């Protein structure tokens, strides 16, 4: 990677949303940059710049990785990412871009089996949204093979695990099941966010949890949930019944 992205804190309660605000700075660092004499094939210039900036960044208390999932297909923001879950945030690590999501910004987690597809989407609703440049992402959509089995070992102490479970996390040191289920349960347990699954609704054939529909020029699927509709896929939208 030849890019270092610096994210800046934004107070959404104090900034007039109509005004421009600096939310990030992206540095392009050529691999042969002469300002970093310590760089070589093992240490590219972008990593050298990152190492110099790291001591001046705000520590989010990430600590060690608690759980990780390799090469997850992500629909929004699009790409394949390694997902690392920490005690206070989870990170999306891709070939071109990385993202960090604070658990405090997660509104709710949804598990949505895709219609006419052997895939299941785990949707993470955010406020404030993820930002990259002028693009914002109100949702993170992670996609998994529905029947794929996986096992993870949570890297947490027994004491910390007990504290999480006292708050309703329902976690165990070893978690086994289908990939979307394990991912959603681990994220729910670590973040404390509520988890919503599809209910009793079925289509006219009695097979799918959603109905096909059109939004503007794109085809998608509408999931009738307990308190809202969820529209998948462009753009993903949560539509409360009260609205």
PLM region descriptions:
Residues 5-99, 113, 121, 125-243:
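N-terminal recruitment modules of adaptor/scaffold proteins
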Residues 102-103:
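Short C-terminal beta-strands that terminate individual repeats in beta-propeller domains
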Residues 110-116:
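Short, conserved beta-turn/loop elements at beta-strand boundaries and strand-helix junctions
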């Amino acid at each position: 990677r030849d890019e270092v992205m610096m994210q800046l804190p934004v107070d959404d309660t104090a900034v007039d949303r109509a005004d421009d605000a600096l939310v990030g700075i992206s540095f392009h660092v050529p691999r042969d940059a002469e300002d970093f004499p310590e760089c070589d094939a093992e240490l590219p210039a972008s990593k050298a710049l990152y190492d110099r900036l790291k001591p001046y960044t705000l520590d989010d208390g990430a600590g060690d990785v608690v759980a990780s999932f390799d090469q997850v297909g992500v629909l929004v923001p699009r790409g394949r990412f390694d997902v690392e879950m920490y005690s206070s945030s989870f990170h999306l690590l891709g070939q071109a871009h990385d993202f960090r999501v604070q658990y405090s910004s997660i509104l709710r987690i949804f598990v949505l089996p895709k219609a006419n597809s052997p895939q299941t989407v785990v949707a993470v609703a955010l406020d404030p949204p993820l930002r990259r440049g002028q693009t914002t992402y109100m949702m993170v959509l992670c996609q998994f093979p529905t029947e794929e089995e996986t096992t993870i070992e949570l890297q947490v102490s027994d004491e910390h695990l007990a504290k999480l479970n006292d708050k309703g996390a329902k976690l165990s040191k070893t978690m086994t099941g289908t990939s979307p289920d394990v991912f959603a349960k681990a994220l729910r347990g670590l973040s404390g966010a509520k988890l919503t699954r599809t209910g009793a609704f079925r289509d006219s054939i009695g097979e799918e949890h959603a109905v096909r529909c059109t939004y503007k020029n794109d085809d998608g699927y509408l999931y009738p949930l307990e308190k809202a509709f969820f529209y998948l896929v462009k753009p993903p939208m949560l539509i409360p019944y009260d609205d």
